[in-house]
Amino acid sequence: MKILQLGKFYPIRGGVEKVMYDLMTGLSAMGVSCDMLCAACEKEEVGERQLNERAKLMCMRSFAKVKATMLSPAMMFKMRRIRKDYDIVHVHHPDPMACLALWFSGYKGKVALHWHSDIIKQRKLLKLYKPLQRWLINRADVIIGTSPVYLKASPWLRDVQDKTVCLPIGVVPLDVDVEGAAALREEYKGKKIIFSLGRLVPYKGYKYLIDSARHLDNSYVILIGGGGPLKTPLLEQIENSGLQDKVKLLGFLSDSEVTAYFGACDLFCMSSVYATVAFGIVQIEAMSAGKPVVATKIPGSGVSWVNAHKESGINVEPKDSAALALAFKRILECEDTYNAYSEQASQRYWTMFTKAKMIEKCVEIYKNL
Protein backbone atom coordinates (compact mmCIF):
# COMPACT_ATOMS: atom_id res chain seq x y z
CA MET A 1 0.00 0.00 0.00
CA LYS A 2 1.45 3.33 -1.10
CA ILE A 3 -0.16 6.60 0.00
CA LEU A 4 0.13 10.22 -1.14
CA GLN A 5 -0.87 13.09 1.14
CA LEU A 6 -1.97 15.94 -1.15
CA GLY A 7 -2.75 19.50 -0.10
CA LYS A 8 -1.80 22.86 1.39
CA PHE A 9 1.77 24.05 1.71
CA TYR A 10 5.08 23.75 3.48
CA PRO A 11 6.61 24.75 5.85
CA ILE A 12 3.81 24.09 8.33
CA ARG A 13 1.64 27.15 8.96
CA GLY A 14 -1.51 25.69 10.48
CA GLY A 15 -3.49 22.66 11.53
CA VAL A 16 -4.18 21.17 8.09
CA GLU A 17 -0.52 21.13 7.13
CA LYS A 18 0.44 19.67 10.51
CA VAL A 19 -2.06 16.83 10.11
CA MET A 20 -0.70 16.05 6.63
CA TYR A 21 2.87 16.01 7.86
CA ASP A 22 2.05 13.96 10.96
CA LEU A 23 0.19 11.38 8.87
CA MET A 24 3.16 11.07 6.51
CA THR A 25 5.71 10.63 9.29
CA GLY A 26 3.45 8.45 11.43
CA LEU A 27 2.39 6.11 8.64
CA SER A 28 5.94 5.72 7.33
CA ALA A 29 7.14 4.91 10.86
CA MET A 30 4.55 2.08 10.92
CA GLY A 31 5.95 0.65 7.69
CA VAL A 32 3.41 2.21 5.30
CA SER A 33 4.92 4.03 2.32
CA CYS A 34 3.57 7.58 2.44
CA ASP A 35 4.74 10.65 0.52
CA MET A 36 3.47 14.24 0.61
CA LEU A 37 2.93 16.60 -2.33
CA CYS A 38 2.31 20.27 -1.60
CA ALA A 39 3.09 23.80 -2.73
CA ALA A 40 6.06 25.61 -1.20
CA CYS A 41 5.25 28.97 0.35
CA GLU A 42 8.95 29.87 0.65
CA LYS A 43 11.45 29.63 -2.22
CA GLU A 44 14.08 27.87 -0.13
CA GLU A 45 11.66 25.02 0.56
CA VAL A 46 11.22 24.08 -3.12
CA GLY A 47 12.48 20.59 -3.86
CA GLU A 48 12.21 16.96 -2.78
CA ARG A 49 13.44 15.51 0.51
CA GLN A 50 13.64 11.83 1.41
CA LEU A 51 12.68 11.92 5.10
CA ASN A 52 13.11 8.18 5.58
CA GLU A 53 13.02 5.08 3.37
CA ARG A 54 9.21 5.22 3.19
CA ALA A 55 8.48 8.97 3.17
CA LYS A 56 9.31 11.67 0.63
CA LEU A 57 8.31 15.33 0.89
CA MET A 58 7.73 17.03 -2.48
CA CYS A 59 7.41 20.84 -2.28
CA MET A 60 6.59 22.42 -5.62
CA ARG A 61 7.24 25.98 -6.70
CA SER A 62 4.34 28.44 -6.42
CA PHE A 63 4.11 31.92 -7.93
CA ALA A 64 1.37 33.61 -5.91
CA LYS A 65 -0.96 33.26 -2.96
CA VAL A 66 -4.66 34.00 -3.39
CA LYS A 67 -6.51 34.09 -0.07
CA ALA A 68 -5.26 30.90 1.62
CA THR A 69 -4.38 29.08 -1.62
CA MET A 70 -0.93 28.84 -3.18
CA LEU A 71 -1.05 28.91 -6.99
CA SER A 72 1.27 26.16 -8.19
CA PRO A 73 1.06 24.83 -11.75
CA ALA A 74 4.17 22.80 -10.89
CA MET A 75 2.11 20.90 -8.32
CA MET A 76 -0.47 20.04 -10.98
CA PHE A 77 2.11 18.72 -13.44
CA LYS A 78 3.95 16.79 -10.73
CA MET A 79 0.70 15.12 -9.68
CA ARG A 80 0.06 14.11 -13.28
CA ARG A 81 3.55 12.60 -13.59
CA ILE A 82 3.28 10.52 -10.42
CA ARG A 83 -0.41 9.57 -10.63
CA LYS A 84 0.32 5.88 -11.22
CA ASP A 85 2.68 5.56 -8.25
CA TYR A 86 0.05 5.50 -5.50
CA ASP A 87 -2.75 3.19 -4.38
CA ILE A 88 -4.51 5.94 -2.41
CA VAL A 89 -4.41 9.72 -2.68
CA HIS A 90 -5.39 11.38 0.60
CA VAL A 91 -6.40 14.92 -0.36
CA HIS A 92 -6.86 17.57 2.31
CA HIS A 93 -9.69 20.11 1.99
CA PRO A 94 -10.05 23.09 1.86
CA ASP A 95 -7.38 23.62 -0.77
CA PRO A 96 -8.57 24.36 -4.33
CA MET A 97 -5.03 23.86 -5.65
CA ALA A 98 -4.87 20.28 -4.39
CA CYS A 99 -8.30 19.54 -5.81
CA LEU A 100 -7.33 21.01 -9.18
CA ALA A 101 -4.10 18.98 -9.20
CA LEU A 102 -6.04 15.77 -8.54
CA TRP A 103 -8.59 16.54 -11.25
CA PHE A 104 -5.88 17.49 -13.78
CA SER A 105 -3.83 14.37 -13.06
CA GLY A 106 -6.43 11.88 -14.28
CA TYR A 107 -5.64 9.68 -11.26
CA LYS A 108 -7.68 6.44 -11.34
CA GLY A 109 -7.03 4.97 -7.89
CA LYS A 110 -8.75 5.32 -4.53
CA VAL A 111 -9.32 8.80 -3.07
CA ALA A 112 -9.65 9.66 0.62
CA LEU A 113 -11.01 13.19 1.08
CA HIS A 114 -10.08 14.75 4.43
CA TRP A 115 -12.72 17.41 5.08
CA HIS A 116 -11.04 19.68 7.64
CA SER A 117 -13.60 22.46 7.23
CA ASP A 118 -16.00 24.16 4.84
CA ILE A 119 -14.87 27.23 2.95
CA ILE A 120 -16.55 29.96 4.98
CA LYS A 121 -14.85 33.33 4.50
CA GLN A 122 -13.87 33.25 0.81
CA ARG A 123 -17.38 33.30 -0.64
CA LYS A 124 -16.37 34.73 -4.02
CA LEU A 125 -13.71 32.04 -4.38
CA LEU A 126 -16.27 29.41 -3.39
CA LYS A 127 -18.56 30.41 -6.25
CA LEU A 128 -15.76 29.67 -8.71
CA TYR A 129 -14.61 26.56 -6.88
CA LYS A 130 -18.03 25.01 -6.20
CA PRO A 131 -18.19 22.79 -9.35
CA LEU A 132 -14.71 21.41 -8.67
CA GLN A 133 -15.55 20.90 -4.99
CA ARG A 134 -18.67 18.95 -5.94
CA TRP A 135 -16.56 16.83 -8.32
CA LEU A 136 -14.13 16.09 -5.46
CA ILE A 137 -16.92 15.06 -3.08
CA ASN A 138 -18.37 12.71 -5.69
CA ARG A 139 -14.94 11.37 -6.67
CA ALA A 140 -13.96 10.49 -3.10
CA ASP A 141 -14.27 6.87 -1.99
CA VAL A 142 -14.33 7.96 1.66
CA ILE A 143 -14.75 11.36 3.31
CA ILE A 144 -12.87 11.82 6.57
CA GLY A 145 -13.97 14.38 9.16
CA THR A 146 -12.21 15.49 12.32
CA SER A 147 -15.38 15.29 14.42
CA PRO A 148 -18.84 13.71 14.03
CA VAL A 149 -20.36 17.14 14.66
CA TYR A 150 -18.70 18.74 11.65
CA LEU A 151 -19.44 15.81 9.36
CA LYS A 152 -23.15 16.08 10.14
CA ALA A 153 -23.30 19.89 10.11
CA SER A 154 -21.55 20.59 6.81
CA PRO A 155 -24.17 21.39 4.14
CA TRP A 156 -21.82 20.01 1.48
CA LEU A 157 -21.78 16.53 3.02
CA ARG A 158 -25.47 16.00 3.75
CA ASP A 159 -26.02 13.80 0.70
CA VAL A 160 -22.91 11.66 1.19
CA GLN A 161 -23.18 10.68 4.86
CA ASP A 162 -22.95 7.00 3.89
CA LYS A 163 -19.29 7.40 2.95
CA THR A 164 -18.15 9.57 5.87
CA VAL A 165 -15.98 8.45 8.77
CA CYS A 166 -14.61 10.32 11.78
CA LEU A 167 -10.85 10.51 12.35
CA PRO A 168 -10.09 12.80 15.31
CA ILE A 169 -6.85 14.73 15.04
CA GLY A 170 -4.11 13.40 17.29
CA VAL A 171 -0.90 14.99 18.55
CA VAL A 172 2.11 13.90 20.54
CA PRO A 173 1.92 14.99 24.20
CA LEU A 174 3.50 18.33 24.97
CA ASP A 175 7.09 18.16 26.14
CA VAL A 176 6.74 20.97 28.66
CA ASP A 177 9.68 23.31 29.25
CA VAL A 178 9.71 22.73 33.01
CA GLU A 179 12.25 25.44 33.82
CA GLY A 180 10.45 27.94 31.62
CA ALA A 181 7.12 27.07 33.24
CA ALA A 182 8.59 27.51 36.72
CA ALA A 183 9.97 30.92 35.75
CA LEU A 184 6.55 32.00 34.50
CA ARG A 185 4.87 30.76 37.69
CA GLU A 186 7.32 32.89 39.63
CA GLU A 187 6.67 35.90 37.38
CA TYR A 188 2.92 35.60 37.96
CA LYS A 189 3.18 34.37 41.53
CA GLY A 190 -0.16 34.22 43.33
CA LYS A 191 -2.12 34.54 40.07
CA LYS A 192 -4.57 32.15 38.45
CA ILE A 193 -3.17 31.94 34.91
CA ILE A 194 -5.52 31.62 31.94
CA PHE A 195 -3.68 30.95 28.67
CA SER A 196 -4.89 31.24 25.09
CA LEU A 197 -2.97 30.78 21.85
CA GLY A 198 -3.67 31.65 18.22
CA ARG A 199 -3.62 34.31 15.54
CA LEU A 200 -5.11 37.65 16.52
CA VAL A 201 -7.99 37.52 14.04
CA PRO A 202 -11.74 38.18 14.45
CA TYR A 203 -12.97 34.58 14.49
CA LYS A 204 -10.80 33.78 17.54
CA GLY A 205 -13.06 35.96 19.70
CA TYR A 206 -10.23 37.53 21.70
CA LYS A 207 -12.13 40.75 22.33
CA TYR A 208 -14.60 38.70 24.39
CA LEU A 209 -11.82 36.93 26.26
CA ILE A 210 -10.25 40.29 27.08
CA ASP A 211 -13.61 41.68 28.17
CA SER A 212 -14.10 38.69 30.49
CA ALA A 213 -11.32 40.13 32.68
CA ARG A 214 -13.75 42.87 33.77
CA HIS A 215 -15.68 40.15 35.59
CA LEU A 216 -12.60 38.75 37.37
CA ASP A 217 -10.74 39.99 40.43
CA ASN A 218 -7.04 40.80 40.54
CA SER A 219 -6.06 37.21 41.35
CA TYR A 220 -6.53 36.36 37.66
CA VAL A 221 -4.29 37.05 34.67
CA ILE A 222 -5.12 36.26 31.03
CA LEU A 223 -2.14 35.59 28.75
CA ILE A 224 -2.72 35.51 24.98
CA GLY A 225 0.05 34.19 22.71
CA GLY A 226 0.25 34.90 18.99
CA GLY A 227 0.38 37.79 16.55
CA GLY A 228 -1.95 39.05 13.87
CA PRO A 229 -3.83 41.99 12.38
CA LEU A 230 -5.91 42.70 15.50
CA LYS A 231 -2.92 43.38 17.75
CA THR A 232 -3.36 47.16 17.80
CA PRO A 233 -7.14 47.25 18.38
CA LEU A 234 -6.84 44.59 21.09
CA LEU A 235 -4.09 46.55 22.84
CA GLU A 236 -6.32 49.62 22.65
CA GLN A 237 -9.20 47.64 24.14
CA ILE A 238 -7.00 46.51 27.03
CA GLU A 239 -5.80 50.06 27.70
CA ASN A 240 -9.21 51.72 27.33
CA SER A 241 -10.73 49.18 29.73
CA GLY A 242 -7.94 49.58 32.28
CA LEU A 243 -7.05 45.89 32.09
CA GLN A 244 -3.28 46.21 31.66
CA ASP A 245 -2.63 44.26 34.88
CA LYS A 246 -5.08 41.49 34.02
CA VAL A 247 -4.50 40.85 30.30
CA LYS A 248 -1.20 40.50 28.43
CA LEU A 249 -0.64 40.05 24.69
CA LEU A 250 2.52 37.97 24.44
CA GLY A 251 3.13 38.21 20.69
CA PHE A 252 4.73 35.39 18.71
CA LEU A 253 5.94 32.50 20.87
CA SER A 254 8.59 29.93 19.97
CA ASP A 255 7.75 26.24 20.33
CA SER A 256 9.66 26.10 23.61
CA GLU A 257 7.90 29.19 24.93
CA VAL A 258 4.52 27.71 24.00
CA THR A 259 5.20 24.59 26.06
CA ALA A 260 6.36 26.74 28.97
CA TYR A 261 3.11 28.72 28.97
CA PHE A 262 1.06 25.53 28.68
CA GLY A 263 2.99 24.16 31.65
CA ALA A 264 2.60 27.33 33.71
CA CYS A 265 -1.08 28.01 33.10
CA ASP A 266 -3.90 26.76 35.27
CA LEU A 267 -6.45 26.66 32.47
CA PHE A 268 -6.62 27.01 28.69
CA CYS A 269 -9.29 29.07 26.95
CA MET A 270 -10.53 28.84 23.36
CA SER A 271 -12.85 31.80 22.82
CA SER A 272 -13.52 31.32 19.09
CA VAL A 273 -16.83 32.60 17.73
CA TYR A 274 -17.19 31.16 14.21
CA ALA A 275 -17.10 27.68 12.66
CA THR A 276 -13.93 28.69 10.80
CA VAL A 277 -12.42 26.82 13.75
CA ALA A 278 -13.58 23.26 13.12
CA PHE A 279 -11.61 21.36 15.77
CA GLY A 280 -9.11 23.36 17.83
CA ILE A 281 -5.85 21.41 18.04
CA VAL A 282 -4.62 23.69 20.83
CA GLN A 283 -7.32 22.22 23.06
CA ILE A 284 -5.90 18.72 22.88
CA GLU A 285 -2.38 20.07 23.41
CA ALA A 286 -3.65 21.66 26.62
CA MET A 287 -5.36 18.40 27.63
CA SER A 288 -2.12 16.50 27.07
CA ALA A 289 -0.59 18.73 29.74
CA GLY A 290 -3.51 18.05 32.09
CA LYS A 291 -5.04 21.50 31.73
CA PRO A 292 -8.82 22.01 31.90
CA VAL A 293 -10.32 23.86 28.93
CA VAL A 294 -12.97 26.54 28.61
CA ALA A 295 -14.26 26.65 25.03
CA THR A 296 -17.26 27.89 23.08
CA LYS A 297 -20.32 26.11 21.70
CA ILE A 298 -19.98 27.21 18.08
CA PRO A 299 -22.88 25.93 15.96
CA GLY A 300 -21.65 23.40 13.41
CA SER A 301 -18.12 23.24 14.83
CA GLY A 302 -16.40 20.33 16.54
CA VAL A 303 -14.74 22.56 19.16
CA SER A 304 -17.27 21.78 21.90
CA TRP A 305 -17.12 18.07 21.01
CA VAL A 306 -13.36 18.03 21.53
CA ASN A 307 -13.78 19.70 24.92
CA ALA A 308 -16.36 17.47 26.62
CA HIS A 309 -18.62 19.70 28.73
CA LYS A 310 -18.20 19.14 32.48
CA GLU A 311 -15.62 16.45 31.76
CA SER A 312 -12.45 18.03 30.35
CA GLY A 313 -13.73 21.55 30.96
CA ILE A 314 -16.70 23.83 30.38
CA ASN A 315 -18.28 25.05 27.13
CA VAL A 316 -20.12 28.38 26.98
CA GLU A 317 -22.01 30.34 24.36
CA PRO A 318 -19.83 32.33 21.91
CA LYS A 319 -19.41 36.09 22.39
CA ASP A 320 -20.40 35.91 26.07
CA SER A 321 -17.68 37.49 28.20
CA ALA A 322 -19.55 37.04 31.47
CA ALA A 323 -20.06 33.33 30.76
CA LEU A 324 -16.34 32.89 30.10
CA ALA A 325 -15.50 34.55 33.41
CA LEU A 326 -18.03 32.43 35.29
CA ALA A 327 -16.57 29.25 33.77
CA PHE A 328 -13.07 30.31 34.84
CA LYS A 329 -14.30 30.85 38.40
CA ARG A 330 -16.16 27.54 38.57
CA ILE A 331 -13.04 25.62 37.59
CA LEU A 332 -10.34 27.61 39.37
CA GLU A 333 -12.01 28.52 42.66
CA CYS A 334 -12.71 24.97 43.84
CA GLU A 335 -9.69 22.69 44.22
CA ASP A 336 -11.69 19.46 43.96
CA THR A 337 -13.42 20.65 40.78
CA TYR A 338 -10.12 21.75 39.28
CA ASN A 339 -8.39 18.45 40.05
CA ALA A 340 -11.27 16.45 38.57
CA TYR A 341 -11.29 18.45 35.33
CA SER A 342 -7.51 18.27 35.10
CA GLU A 343 -7.46 14.48 35.46
CA GLN A 344 -10.38 14.02 33.05
CA ALA A 345 -8.77 16.32 30.47
CA SER A 346 -5.64 14.17 30.55
CA GLN A 347 -7.69 10.97 30.29
CA ARG A 348 -9.64 12.33 27.33
CA TYR A 349 -6.42 13.17 25.52
CA TRP A 350 -4.88 9.72 26.07
CA THR A 351 -8.12 7.96 25.16
CA MET A 352 -8.98 9.87 21.99
CA PHE A 353 -6.42 12.36 20.74
CA THR A 354 -2.93 10.86 20.59
CA LYS A 355 -1.01 10.84 17.34
CA ALA A 356 -0.67 7.05 17.60
CA LYS A 357 -4.45 6.59 17.72
CA MET A 358 -4.89 8.89 14.71
CA ILE A 359 -2.38 6.86 12.70
CA GLU A 360 -3.92 3.51 13.70
CA LYS A 361 -7.42 4.65 12.75
CA CYS A 362 -6.14 6.08 9.46
CA VAL A 363 -4.60 2.73 8.51
CA GLU A 364 -7.97 1.06 9.22
CA ILE A 365 -9.70 3.53 6.91
CA TYR A 366 -7.21 2.83 4.13
CA LYS A 367 -7.59 -0.93 4.52
CA ASN A 368 -11.37 -0.64 4.14
CA LEU A 369 -11.11 1.11 0.78
Roles of regions detected by a PLM:
Residues 4, 183-214, 223:
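Conserved donor-binding/catalytic core segment of Leloir-type glycosyltransferases
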Residues 38, 133-179, 249:
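Donor nucleotide-sugar binding/catalytic pocket of nucleotide-sugar-dependent glycosyltransferases
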Residues 91-98:
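Short His-centered aromatic/hydrophobic patch
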Residues 137, 252-253, 260-265:
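Short alpha-helical donor nucleotide-sugar binding micro-motif in glycosyltransferases
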Residues 233-253:
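Nucleotide-activated donor-binding/catalytic signature segment of Leloir-type glycosyltransferases, i.e.
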Residues 263-278, 291:
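Acidic donor-binding loop of glycosyltransferase active sites
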Residues 288, 292-297:
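Short hydrophobic beta-strand element within catalytic cores of glycosyltransferases
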Residues 308-321, 329-335:
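Conserved acidic donor-binding segment of nucleotide-sugar-dependent glycosyltransferases
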